[in-house]
């Protein structure tokens, strides 16, 4: 217990000494300002943080909450606001504000939250305004003092000035910058996207991504020129290679339509739903068919969807044979019969 007390006592004494030292430093700063420091603001340190507008004696603000009357000093270089007395100067606590950067003029940049150094080319105007005895706030112009005749004269002077400025610009820049009206015939001719004679102008009609671009339209150029585009449409050149009319992804492509070529090997690449134009039974067996075959032969069962050698048959066979049970759906050797045969079995 004794060792614990001996440890706590020096720590408490150290805290008391530090707080006393800080209080003494604050008082020294206040006395330094009272002795004649040329700083209109009370600050513990110039590296303070500030958000908001700085309250300086250059602007009119009669807010008594910001006036620290117990810490007033006189700074003769800045003119005081008429709303306050000649002995009022403002003090400011550094903890109320947050500032990032260095302040260049102490009366303008402190209104803003700044990141960096201020650069103001019109600093001479502010210095001239500070050194003058005129009021730094703008007075509202009274409308009662203006007569009707003064208003008419002012409007006439402004109209003459505008006309003179237009004439000066016209003489200076010439006729190139004057407003020119577009004829109606030109507007109507440019509405439709007609193919121009120049090949360079033809490419300007489309949306381009570098040298290769997507084209949504038709062109009269050769077929090798069309292969660079993703095309949604029909080429004007009707050649025998009809596959190039459609959207292509490499050598194999999806075709939505019917070709005029009766080539069986070409049809093998497609998933076909419908009739085949070629009357070849071997070609029909390659597809999953939902329809009727064009070839009316005796084997009517091939009209249906087949799964291997066994198939589901939904219909009636045209061949009336003794084996009536084959007309129905069969599952293995035993089958389910939905109907009645023509021959009465015992």
Swiss-Prot record:
Central nervous system. It is found in: Secreted. Residues 160-172 have a biased composition (Polar residues). The modification Phenylalanine amide is found at residues 51, 100, 115, 209, 216, 232, 249, 256, 273, 290, 307, 314, 331, 338. The keyword Iron does not apply. Keywords: Amidation, Cleavage on pair of basic residues, Neuropeptide, Repeat, Secreted, Signal. InterPro entries: FMRFamid-related_peptide-like, FMRFamide-related_np. Residues 20-45, 54-94, 103-109, 118-203, 219-226, 235-243, 259-267, 276-283, 293-301, 317-325, 341-346 form a propeptide. Residues 137-185 are annotated as: Disordered. Residues 141-152, 173-185 have a biased composition (Basic and acidic residues). GO terms for cellular component: extracellular region. Residues 1-19 form the signal peptide. Can function as both cardioregulatory hormones and transmitters and may regulate cardiovascular function. Belongs to the FARP (FMRFamide related peptide) family. This is FMRFamide-related peptides type HF-1.
